[in-house]
A protein has these predicted regions:
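Short secondary-structure boundary/capping segments
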Residues: 115-117
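A detector of repeated loop/turn-to-beta-strand junctions in beta-rich toroidal repeat architectures
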Residues: 28, 46, 50-55, 119-127, ...
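Blade-edge beta-strand/turn elements of extracellular beta-propeller
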Residues: 1-7, 59-81, 123-168
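Acidic, Gly/Ser/Thr-rich repeat motifs that build Ca2+-stabilized beta-propeller blades
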Residues: 1-111
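Short acidic/His/Gly/Ser-rich catalytic and metal-binding motifs that mark active-site loops
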Residues: 108-113, 146-149
Length: 168
């Protein structure tokens, strides 16, 4: 596949996870890609475009043609103010098959004085904005659905948080 990935500083292809622990058939494999995309900009530009985001896509792996097919967007996360502290680890739990997505604080305002409104309460900022998916480890199904109630509440995105306060 060809992806137009923003690669400024710590943006880019952030994580890859593949299903199967040796027990599943090769043609049942799913591949998860986690990357930063900023529309209408060159890959290495430090964009503050509102279309900029970190995305998790699920693909089926076509073994016959060695291709990723049927892309499905399962999670959209912020990428601003960035371009640092995007995190990026994807992990699949072999036992329950949940997907864990790590995302950093995206270079919060304490370190980037020109940006405002990006510090959230999950970063232990008392007067921060409500959680928006950044600064945590998120847990979801392979279809992108929340798993029960999260650590912070029942509403989206609170129900995705498995851990919070993650800097990078």
């Amino acid at each position: 596949i060809h992806l137009n990935v923003s690669s400024k500083d710590e943006r880019g292809l952030l994580g890859i996870a593949v299903t199967g622990n040796g027990e599943s058939k090769q043609d049942d494999r799913l591949v998860f890609l986690y990357y930063t995309y900023c529309p209408k900009v060159k890959a290495n530009v430090n964009s503050t475009s509102q279309g900029c985001g970190n995305y998790v896509y699920r693909y089926k792996f076509d073994t016959e043609n060695s291709k990723l097919i049927e892309p499905q967007l399962i999670l959209t996360l912020p990428a601003l103010p960035g371009p640092s502290h995007n995190g990026g680890v994807l992990e699949l739990d072999d036992k329950d098959e949940n997907l864990y997505v790590a995302i950093g604080d995206l270079q919060s305002t304490r370190f980037n004085k020109n940006q405002t409104g990006y510090d959230t309460t999950v970063q232990n900022i008392v007067n921060g904005t409500p959680p928006d998916g950044r600064a945590g480890i998120l847990r979801l199904t392979q279809d992108g659905k929340p798993i029960g109630n999260g650590r912070l509440g029942e509403e989206y995105p609170l129900n995705l948080y498995y851990a919070y306060g993650v800097k990078n």
